[in-house]
Amino acid sequence: MTSMPLRFSTLVMVLAALTGLPIASWGQGAQPNAAVSIRGAGSTLAAPLWKKWIEEYAVGHRGVSITYDAVGSGEGVKRFIARDVDFAASDEILTESEAAKLPEAAVMLPVTAGMIALAYNIPGVNSEIRLPRDVYVDIFAGAIKRWDDPRIKAANPGLAFPHRDIALVARQDSSGTTAAFTKHLAAIGGGWRNAGMRVGKLIDWPKG
């Protein structure tokens, strides 16, 4: 499996309810008078960072239990709106309808940014390949269907590509990463929109 980083990043936002989280009321090294449980959910992109933060915070705060479910940005926001979690992380900014449903005490803050990469596995091709922007747009839009397509071969002279179908692997849940990626595809040119594809957290990818 080889990956090709894309030259754009996505910002991860965190939603938090300021009520019901009494963790800021004691000083460094002090412990809360009662056990505190904090639940979060959302972005899979940010999950490794949350895991690290939670582990580091737990070292000096034995009375605080923090959990984070990496269920995707859309599901995380849904759980936060339903008051099922205390905070949620999303790679995509909230829609107006989602923002209207937030608790009054909710705040939204940027916490990190991440890169998105394309991963590919081509039998018989062990070298890194080049995929121009308009080419990978048409791959994900379903206009380029095989690895030996003339446009892929033209971008990679000297490489022998097999006459095999390109099998797309993409998120099937409500994902902020999908929203960021499809925004990128739509911004490159008209190919994405012209193919009838849309931008969003959950889309219908072309069937191979």
Feature map (PLM): residue ranges:
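Bacterial N-terminal signal peptides
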Residues: 9-22
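Flexible loop/hinge segments at secondary-structure junctions
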Residues: 26-208
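N-terminal secretory signal peptides that target proteins for export/translocation
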Residues: 1-6
